[in-house]
Amino acid sequence: ADYRDIEGKSRQEYNDDAGMSVMLSTEAELDQLVHKMVTAINDIFCPNVEYVGTDLTGTTADGSTFTITQGMKVLDTDNCAVGSDGKLPPQELFSRVGTDRYTEVNVTDAAGNTKTYYVYNEESATDISKMYTLSSLKVNDEIISQPSYIPHLTQDSDNKQVAQQLGTAFTEMWKKNEISLNPNATSKCTFMEYYAQMIGETGTAGSVYNTMSETLNN
């Protein structure tokens, strides 16, 4: 089970599937917690915005044609921080084994000016290797080899100024009530509250089954 067994499911759908099993529901809840935390962290390090405007057609690094359409997510190059190398796109902390975070697209206008867009590679609905899920996550290899590549500087890299807004964003991330344990939950909670609820739910189920076992054995 994974976060897809919770995300977007109605109470009935959940209760007829993963919700019927303590093991499956716990797996799904844990994966949802990881999914939400990982995507929230990556979105702070590598913020996206929706592209607004007419369609743009450019080329990718391998020479393929790529069209950027309205509503696609692209890197917010105006507001993102960078690592010690000062390069765009900045490195995400957690990566999917099946795809990079961005596709680099170079678009040349009628005047011959070229602009680079970093188009976010959305999570696949069917290919697990392209999802931020426990079975296909890893710490970014680039950051493992060079930890200073974690985004932490403003793009005015000559001054090596620390991007203070990142600290504020991470503080706010922990405070937000944006996640529900499962479709049966009546309210949203913070990550810490979610974890406490998940452990409490599993502990309660374990206690019930233990009592049933003891009763049957007596």
Role assignments for model-derived ranges:
Residues 1-218:
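Structural signature of extracellular appendage/secretion-system components
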